[in-house]
């Protein structure tokens, strides 16, 4: 059994960091001079996990199951000096950034490379139940904005989209091998693309001549099949209400490559199985399908007496945060408190 060492209450936080939201994104886009990664709904996360105490007395283990670059976790560790953290992520490249960012808190942090589908066994090996579990779903800006990762429809790169390199199937495999009806279903159900059948038909026609290998070639074909011009600037710079024509198809491909629906279900189940009584689950989603899965899971658990829903409606970013971080516009945070263990105990 494994335990993360308890923090020394007399010592306070290990090397407190001075960064807050304004300077939290030290990483920059390789094709831009601007900052990219700012954790969304950060203040809402701090308040939700800290409860109504309004102080820094939170004590115990929190698991960040989508650690990313460590933005949320760094703020939690700084805000709550007695808190300990288990940070988990499936992307080893992003984990290297998190390790550096969280180094000042090294004695309070353990970092693991794992998927949410591996959480049940990982948490089962701990000798303490977490008091909090945080999910920040979807792709990180540090993944989306690195062309070589293959997530971007604005920058050219290999058509990959794997968050975990242990996976063998890439976006190119799906685009080049799935039949037309399966592609159309994927684009519609996982991406919400209304022109899914037109896009799928265009892909199948085009790949007969040459397989897709690069993101730009696919992005341009999608735009052409939908009859929409491609902008040269980023989505965030587009007119209000406008998105890049390839957005929904790329989202659907990313979700399929990384099996995000199955991973989310596994992560929610692990939270139910291992959170301590009165522990809180915090789930941030950017996709209506993901939010629906979380909502239904918690609603069913609430009917069974497993969860107290602390947010009947999801928390959303305010106008100021959206102005400073446009990606926060679609973020939704749901919070629930664990009432009892699956076996019926309290």
Feature roles, as predicted:
Residues 2-8, 12, 16-346:
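S-adenosyl-L-methionine-dependent methyltransferase catalytic core, i.e., the SAM/SAH-binding region
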């Amino acid at each position: 059994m494994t335990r993360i060492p308890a923090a020394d209450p007399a010592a306070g936080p290990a090397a407190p960091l001075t960064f807050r939201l304004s300077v939290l994104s030290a990483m920059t886009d390789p094709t831009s001079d601007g900052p990219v990664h700012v954790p969304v709904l950060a203040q809402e996360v701090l308040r939700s996990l800290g409860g109504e105490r309004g102080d820094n007395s939170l004590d115990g283990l929190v698991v960040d199951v989508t650690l990313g670059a460590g933005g949320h976790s760094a703020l939690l560790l700084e805000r709550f000096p007695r808190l300990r953290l288990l940070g988990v992520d499936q992307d080893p490249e992003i984990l290297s950034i998190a390790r550096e960012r969280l180094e000042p808190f090294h004695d309070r942090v353990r970092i693991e490379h794992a998927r949410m589908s591996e959480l049940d066994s990982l948490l089962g090996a701990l000798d303490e139940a977490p008091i909090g579990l945080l999910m920040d779903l979807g792709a990180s800006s540090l993944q989306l904005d690195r062309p070589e990762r293959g997530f971007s429809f604005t920058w050219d790169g290999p058509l990959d989209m794997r968050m975990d390199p242990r996976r063998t199937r890439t976006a190119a495999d799906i685009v080049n091998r799935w039949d037309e009806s399966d592609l159309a279903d994927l684009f519609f159900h996982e991406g919400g693309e209304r022109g899914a059948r037109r896009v799928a038909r265009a892909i199948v026609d085009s790949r007969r001549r040459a397989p897709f290998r690069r993101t730009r070639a696919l992005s341009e074909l999608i735009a052409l099949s939908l009859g929409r011009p491609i902008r040269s600037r980023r989505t965030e710079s587009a007119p209000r209400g406008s998105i890049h024509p390839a957005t929904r198809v790329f989202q659907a491909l990313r979700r399929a490559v990384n099996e995000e629906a199955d991973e989310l279900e596994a992560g929610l189940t692990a939270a139910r199985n291992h959170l301590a009584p009165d522990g809180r689950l915090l789930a941030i989603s950017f996709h209506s399908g993901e939010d629906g899965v979380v909502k239904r899971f918690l609603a069913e658990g609430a009917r069974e007496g497993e969860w107290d829903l602390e947010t009947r409606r999801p928390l959303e970013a305010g106008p100021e945060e959206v102005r400073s971080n446009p990606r926060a516009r679609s973020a939704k945070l749901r919070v629930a408190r664990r009432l009892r263990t699956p076996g019926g105990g309290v």
